[in-house]
């Protein structure tokens, strides 16, 4: 089983920890320089794209205008009823969002996704995202735009893995359920408005649902969370998962989700001021949570993995977790959450961590499956850009000289 806890904690986690600790913390000399003209053109494109995206997200129709689907289960559409006809404003908003996606995929000049993927692949990629958004709109019309974006990002990781492994795009109920779980669970647990007792009940409910035990639902939010888990279990095990992972594939994904729940619970310690955490404690929490999250994403594409591939995807999750933490330095410092980035005491120390992140990324991609070299290069460049933009978003925690060096 891939999600054997002893395997995760005794084999994968120590190797990723070792890769991180062995990575250099000096400024990377492998970043490609960008000419001043190209930089200005890129900045202008990014600024315009972000302004359009932000305006569009702010124009999200108010919840009072959005049709509420009853019941919300996507599994039995013939039983669904609507409290009113779908709001025209929401339909228009979704169409415009699809147009924005098209521009981002086909016109984006920086990362070169149009050079890494064929036109047919890009079209399929866009279609799968549209399908995902339609399912989100049907399942949770009340969802905030930022939470919708979070779920979409989770789904895009899965879609990228399918492209990386030469598989056609799709949007099965399992990956819909898993992509939506993060905004439904992690955000609930991070929200200080919920009491510790509410969070304990919520975690217990999830644990029981994954384990196949009876559950008591106290709210619509809990009911929808249970439905998302049911969407996953509805297709596991399947002939494809059994062929890829063996007869225990259904048990394996349940174990993976239980470990992910445990990782979310452990991560709450980062904000508990009464607990003493060493740098290694903080590091291991981030590796465990980030690594499991992405390894589960990869599991859902139903394609057998080598030991090296498992290690890459687990390490890739840690990379994405660190990018999140890099972007959230100010917020994490404000609420007392200790991460490898927020725990830095000086701008120099923070810069060294970012340098190490670049070096770690380079070392990790030596393990990257290489069925499509152009797509691998695109993915690596995307990671570099993610680190750069995350650092820029937390610019107040760096020296100006370091930020200027990154900009070059």
Question: At which residue positions do the language-model features occur?
Answer:
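Intrinsically disordered, low-structural-confidence terminal and linker regions
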Residues: 1-43
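Amphipathic alpha-helical protein-interaction segments
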Residues: 21-28, 38, 45-83, 172-180, ...
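Low-complexity, highly charged intrinsically disordered N-terminal segments
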Residues: 74-127
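All-alpha helical catalytic cores of prenyl diphosphate-utilizing isoprenoid enzymes
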Residues: 109-181, 187-188, 192-330, 390-391, ...
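A short, conserved beta-to-alpha structural element at the edge of catalytic cores
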Residues: 213-217, 348-366
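Accessory, usually C-terminal, subdomains that scaffold auxiliary metal cofactors
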Residues: 340-348
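Long, compositionally biased intrinsically disordered regions
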Residues: 358-362, 391-408
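C-terminal anion-handling pockets and recognition modules
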Residues: 368-391
């Amino acid at each position: 089983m891939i999600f054997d806890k002893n395997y995760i904690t005794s084999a994968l986690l120590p190797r990723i920890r070792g890769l991180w600790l062995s990575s250099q913390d000096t400024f990377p000399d492998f970043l490609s320089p960008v000419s001043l003209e190209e930089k200005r053109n890129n900045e202008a494109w990014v600024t315009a794209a972000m302004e359009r995206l932000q305006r569009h997200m702010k124009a999200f129709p108010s919840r009072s205008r959005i049709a509420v689907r009853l019941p919300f289960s996507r599994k039995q559409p013939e039983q669904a009823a609507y409290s009113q006809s779908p709001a025209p404003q929401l339909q228009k908003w979704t169409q415009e969002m699809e147009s924005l996606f098209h521009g981002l995929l086909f016109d984006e000049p920086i990362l070169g996704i149009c050079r890494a993927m064929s036109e047919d692949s890009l079209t399929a990629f866009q279609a799968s995202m549209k399908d995902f958004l339609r399912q989100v709109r049907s399942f949770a019309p009340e969802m905030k735009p930022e939470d919708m974006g979070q779920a979409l990002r989770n789904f895009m990781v899965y879609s990228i893995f399918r492209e990386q492994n030469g598989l056609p795009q799709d949007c099965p109920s399992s990956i819909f359920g898993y992509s939506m779980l993060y905004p439904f669970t992690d955000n609930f647990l991070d929200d200080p408005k919920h009491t510790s007792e509410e969070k304990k009940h919520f975690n217990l409910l999830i644990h029981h649902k994954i384990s196949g035990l009876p559950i008591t639902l106290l709210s619509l939010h809990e009911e929808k969370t249970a439905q998302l888990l049911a969407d996953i279990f509805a297709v596991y095990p399947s002939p494809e998962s059994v062929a890829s992972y063996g007869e225990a594939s259904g048990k394996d994904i349940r174990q993976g989700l239980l470990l992910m729940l445990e990782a979310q619970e452990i991560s709450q310690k980062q904000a508990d001021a009464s607990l003493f955490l060493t740098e290694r404690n903080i590091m291991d929490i981030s590796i465990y949570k980030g690594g499991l999250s992405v390894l589960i994403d990869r599991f859902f594409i139903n394609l057998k993995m080598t030991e090296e591939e498992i290690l890459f995807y687990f390490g890739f999750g840690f990379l994405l977790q660190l990018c999140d933490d890099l972007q959230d330095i100010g917020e994490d410092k404000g609420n007392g959450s200790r991460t490898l980035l927020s725990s830095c005491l000086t701008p120099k120390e923070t810069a060294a961590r970012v340098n190490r992140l670049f070096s770690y990324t380079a070392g990790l991609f030596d393990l990257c499956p290489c069925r499509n070299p152009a797509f691998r290069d695109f993915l690596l460049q995307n990671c570099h850009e993610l680190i750069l933009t995350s650092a820029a978003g937390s610019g107040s925690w760096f020296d100006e000289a370091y930020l200027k060096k990154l900009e070059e």
